[in-house]
Curated annotation (Swiss-Prot):
Organism the protein comes from: Mycobacterium tuberculosis (strain ATCC 25618 / H37Rv)
Effect after changing residue 342 to A: Abolishes proteasome substrate degradation
Binding, ATP: 296-301
Note: Was identified as a natural substrate of the M.tuberculosis proteasome.
Consequence the record notes for mutating residue 299 to Q: Reduces both ATPase activity and ATP affinity. Abolishes proteasome substrate degradation and protection against RNI
Protein name stated in the entry: Proteasome-associated ATPase
The organism's taxonomic lineage, starting at the top: Bacteria, Bacillati, Actinomycetota, Actinomycetes, Mycobacteriales
Amino acid sequence: MGESERSEAFGIPRDSPLSSGDAAELEQLRREAAVLREQLENAVGSHAPTRSARDIHQLEARIDSLAARNSKLMETLKEARQQLLALREEVDRLGQPPSGYGVLLATHDDDTVDVFTSGRKMRLTCSPNIDAASLKKGQTVRLNEALTVVEAGTFEAVGEISTLREILADGHRALVVGHADEERVVWLADPLIAEDLPDGLPEALNDDTRPRKLRPGDSLLVDTKAGYAFERIPKAEVEDLVLEEVPDVSYADIGGLSRQIEQIRDAVELPFLHKELYREYSLRPPKGVLLYGPPGCGKTLIAKAVANSLAKKMAEVRGDDAHEAKSYFLNIKGPELLNKFVGETERHIRLIFQRAREKASEGTPVIVFFDEMDSIFRTRGTGVSSDVETTVVPQLLSEIDGVEGLENVIVIGASNREDMIDPAILRPGRLDVKIKIERPDAEAAQDIYSKYLTEFLPVHADDLAEFDGDRSACIKAMIEKVVDRMYAEIDDNRFLEVTYANGDKEVMYFKDFNSGAMIQNVVDRAKKNAIKSVLETGQPGLRIQHLLDSIVDEFAENEDLPNTTNPDDWARISGKKGERIVYIRTLVTGKSSSASRAIDTESNLGQYL
């Protein structure tokens, strides 16, 4: 057996590295083992020397121990080598020069790119690992010490906010207005170009999934040094106040206000639909309409119906499809327009009218509707805790009849305290037309009930049987009975006894405080009672008794409404004008068993918050 074979027989790897001391000792052991093996081979019979066999086992054990030590040493050396490599990589990384960043301006066919970096426009090469064709304009790129593009980043997410004035003809540039009304032309980054390409350009034809187009007045994130706009920033404070839509409300949905509807159609629709006739007669269309009257009588509903009707009529004049009629109804939530910071309310008003002019420039009618107009345009000088109206009112006046003017824009205001609105707003030439939306009388109430009680409603079999199954006659009788009950001057319908400043007294009935909203509430309450009746008895259908019970419940709930510190203010809000009221006594005798209550007011109370 050779030396290498004997080494492998003892479990020592042929190529295992050993220290000098271990190698010498191992070589001595090998020689001793060779001598002992020769002695064993020369021995004859069964009396082989046991000492030699024992020595061999000891030598083998020692060889195994040395092999284990050698294996452990190899693992230690391997770990040390890996740590050295990691440290070398860290040293190399820390020793690298800093990288720069820039904004990509353009790409070229020879794999070079134009980059704006460190205030300079430079043409640079791309690393072989970068596909220059995949880079997008306006994208952030990383540069090494040799000014080579080595990595593509995202689009810039911080910068200045500028307002879009207009998109230039090529669709890739825009005119924006920055701080201090400074105008500049900037490039549009690729995400904005996808939104904003004009429909006539070839790049826009196949883009069916692009977001909505940019429009003048949008806020853009701009890098003024690189000359790029990256993103459209929503204007939350204005978007929350402005609702752009064509309301799905028509004049047919409004009951009991035919005279007022005719007035507002004459004021709004005629100037838009017959501009030539107005020019021929040198007649100036009204700039605004004021709808005033008690709460719940349909002021907001009429304003929505005006926008809907005007859009359809304009579509007919242009020969467009009525289903694709387009108009804009900017619904301004009056109290939310107020802002505690100086100048913010005025700025919001400017933005609203700027948006209206932008829409109207397309030739589309725009209605700016101010609900609760008295809350933001109070008479100047009447403020107690603030004087915001001294600047807000002039801002509205300048927008209505300023130098720029309003073309295709009409302002509609709604209020139940028209006496609190500044007189300068109500003068002719501003809100020219003033339409009072009165409380419904018995005839108007029948019209309103007919909008809610239709022949499609399920009617109880017993009520139908009284009219030989004629559903139309049954519904008509229901409406007549419920209107008679609501407008009857009986003791159960007495509501208030008011005392005027001159000592006169007057008994007022619930019919004096009816409104379209109350009628809708009565019908809804009756329908709910009909549903409960189905669940309890299993007999479906609406009954006249459900409506009569609902009237009693509705009147009883209104018992606490006049409980106010100042009866005269409450009466004005409710639509009661004339002599000042100093004393109110409730006369409700419905389901409530409590005694009637009186509300008095003292004179010279002064102003209160």
